[in-house]
Amino acid sequence: MADFTTIARPYAKAAFDFAVEKGQLDQWGQMLSFAAEVAQNEQISELLSGSMSADKLAELFIAICGEQVDEFGQNLLKVMAENGRLAALPDVCTLFFVLKKEHEKEIDVEVISATELSDEQCANISQKLEQRLERKVKLNCSVDEALLGGVIIRAGDLVIDNSARGRLNRLSDALQS
C-alpha cells in the first residue's frame, strides 16, 4: 500500500480541528476508525483504485458506512472522494489519533525489559515518566531476554537505554575508540 501521510495530513488536521471545536473528539475517532476499516477492505480498495466517478464512489462509501458516520463525517468523505483521496483514509485516521493524543497530553511509551515487570514496577515507571514528560503515559510493556537485565524505554523521540546489553555495547564502543 502506498504511503499517503502527506496527502492525509490536511484532512486529519481539518477533522481534528472540527472535532475539537464541536467537542466530539471521541465520536470523530470512532467514525474515522470505522471509515478507515472500510477503506482497508480488499473489495473496497479495488473500488477506490477503479474508474468509478467521485460522486458514485462517495455515495457507495457513505452507504457502506451507514449510520456509523454522521453528516459532517459524510461531508469529509465526499470531499476526499472528489479529490480522489479515499484510499488515504487509514492514514487520516492514524494522524487524527496522533493529534488527539497530543491534544490530550497523552503519549504511548514502550517499555522493554529483560524479565516480566510487576504491576508495581509498571506503576512506578509510569509515574516517573508522567512527571518527567508532563503528560499522561500509556505503557506498552514487553519482554526481551536478550537485554540480559534492565530496561529500554521509548517515548516518542526519547529513548532511555538502561539495559545490560546497552551498557556492554557502550563500554565496547568506548574501548574500541
UniProtKB/Swiss-Prot annotation:
Gene3D superfamilies according to UniProt: N-terminal domain of the delta subunit of the F1F0-ATP synthase (1.10.520.20)
Compartments (UniProt record): Cell inner membrane
Pfam family, one: OSCP
Membrane topology of this protein: Peripheral membrane protein
Keywords: ATP synthesis, Cell inner membrane, Cell membrane, CF(1), Hydrogen ion transport, Ion transport, Membrane, Transport
Record keyword Membrane present: yes
Domain of life: Bacteria
GO terms for MF: proton-transporting ATP synthase activity, rotational mechanism
A GO cellular component entry from the record: proton-transporting ATP synthase complex
SUPFAM superfamilies: N-terminal domain of the delta subunit of the F1F0-ATP synthase
Predominant localisation class: membrane
Subunit-structure text: F-type ATPases have 2 components, F(1) - the catalytic core - and F(0) - the membrane proton channel. F(1) has five subunits: alpha(3), beta(3), gamma(1), delta(1), epsilon(1). F(0) has three main subunits: a(1), b(2) and c(10-14). The alpha and beta chains form an alternating ring which encloses part of the gamma chain. F(1) is attached to F(0) by a central stalk formed by the gamma and epsilon chains, while a peripheral stalk is formed by the delta and b chains.
Family: Belongs to the ATPase delta chain family.
Role according to the record: F(1)F(0) ATP synthase produces ATP from ADP in the presence of a proton or sodium gradient. F-type ATPases consist of two structural domains, F(1) containing the extramembraneous catalytic core and F(0) containing the membrane proton channel, linked together by a central stalk and a peripheral stalk. During catalysis, ATP synthesis in the catalytic domain of F(1) is coupled via a rotary mechanism of the central stalk subunits to proton translocation.
Protein name from the UniProt record: ATP synthase subunit delta
Natural source organism: Vibrio vulnificus (strain YJ016)
